[in-house]
Amino acid sequence: MGMAWIVLLLGAGAIIYNHVYRKRMYREIDRLEEWKINLMNRPVPDELAKVKQLNMTGETEQLFERWRQQWDDIVAVKLPNVEEQLFDAERLLDKYRYRQARRLLGQIADGLRRLEEEVHEIIHEVNELIGSEEQSRAEIEELRAAHREAKKALLAYRYTFGSAADLLDVRLTEAEKQFQRFAELTEAGNYLAARDVVLTLKEELGRLTAMMEEIPKLLGECQTSLPAQLAELADGYREMEERGYILDHLHMERTLQEKREKIEQCLAMIHELRIEEAKQIVAELKEEIDALYDLLENEVLAHQYVQTEMPRLSGMLQELAAEAKETEAEALFVQQSYHLAPSDLEKYRSIEKQLHQLQKRFFLIQDRVAEAKTAYSLLKEELEQLVSQIDLMKEEHEQFRTMLQTLRKDELIAREKLDGMRKTLAEALRLVQKSRLPGLPEPYALELAEARRSLQAVAARLEEKPLDMPAVDQALEEAKAAVERLYERTVEMIEQATLAERTIQYGNRYRRRYPAVRKGLEEAEFLFRHYDYEEALRQAVAAVEEVEPGAFDRVQKLWQEDNSREQ
């Protein structure tokens, strides 16, 4: 039973699918039919009718014939073929030959697409021809006006174009012939060729108009402005030479001649209407002439610099020499009192050597200024180098002097530090005296002796001649560590002794009742009398805490309160 249902359902499904598919194929036939009718109704005849308004000769006639034949072929042959194919597709569908029908419909769609492009191309070409004829007619009038204006300007202002006027004449006459050519081509119906003539004319007249704007200005530069600047440069150069400037290195006469030749070259280019090249050369010439002005101005500025810097540098070097002498005396004095490292002495000798070299260079420059054979710009360069070297040397010299002063300052600081440590040691001993201890433990006595020895070592280093500051600093570091350690040890020892004494006193209340406490306290007293305050405190605390836990905290608290009252 189930199997029969499945077969039935599958059969029903196949029938439905078959029906839907056929319907879709018929719809596609209708769409292609509509497309074919649409193509047949395109306004190609109307477009071709517009062409007939033009001169139906030459190129236009040939094009019209080609388009008309193409359209006739589409309407009479190609579209009826499509109609035939659509009819075949319908027959195949009726016979349920779907695959063949589908393939045929695909071919029909491709054919219609190609026909669509062909029709589009015909309409586009027709519009291009008509458009180019309209545009050319409008533009040729504008170009005639531009040509007339150019001829008028050339006639009225011929002198402003110099020798370029003849070639401009030739070019404008050549352009005039193109108007005749345009008329002939239009008459012959060759509108597309006529359009090319319009575009060529437009370009040529644009070029000529631009040239006619630029030539007078360029001629002005080459015939008046630039030669005047060269003459001014030549005068300035001669005048400076007469005033004693050394300018041989500028090779000015040869350079000016080169510029004059360049101007001639530029005029020849204008004559040949090579205007862009001429503009380039004029721009270069302007830059080069500016550079020559700058060179002469540099010499004037360099002369001023040399005049003002020479006396200033002479003064600076004298001042440096005097300072170096003072430094030498100071170094000798310091050397007797202090130990100077070999590198420091070497630095001073190098400063001396540099100073002599700088003086020698300055005298050489002085001689060259007096000789008046060297350009001021070159002398200025040498002086600038000398100035930077003098500045460097001043800096080195200053560093050396600072180092000498630092040595003496370091000695004073070292003596101050030694005094401070002596005071710290005296303060530690005063605390010991004030606390009235029965005696000093041996380790403490050894530390005290060590601290005193370290202070004596610093004092001895400070008495040495010459003074070796790195060794003094080393001794100071060691003494500082020893004294600080001793002071801390003193405070700690006094605290332990006082707390031991107070804990023993506090524990006395338990002596009679507790033999163990008595024994512990007696031992603590024995240790106290033998200066072992740390162990005495430990024993006393252990004995008292045995019978009264927390007793040591109370003793400590009372002692801290007494201390704060005393302070």
From Swiss-Prot:
Gene Ontology terms, cellular component aspect?
A: plasma membrane; septin ring
Keywords of this entry: Cell cycle, Cell division, Cell membrane, Coiled coil, Membrane, Septation, Transmembrane, Transmembrane helix
The membrane-topology field of this record reads:
Single-pass membrane protein
**Organism of origin:** Geobacillus kaustophilus (strain HTA426)
**InterPro entries tied to this protein:** EzrA
Coiled-coil region: 98-159, 251-497
Q: Which residues lie on this side of the membrane: Extracellular?
A: 1-2
| Listed name of the protein | Septation ring formation regulator EzrA
What this chain does, per the record?
Negative regulator of FtsZ ring formation; modulates the frequency and position of FtsZ ring formation. Inhibits FtsZ ring formation at polar sites. Interacts either with FtsZ or with one of its binding partners to promote depolymerization.
Taking the first listed entry, what is the main subcellular location of this protein, grouped into a coarse class? membrane
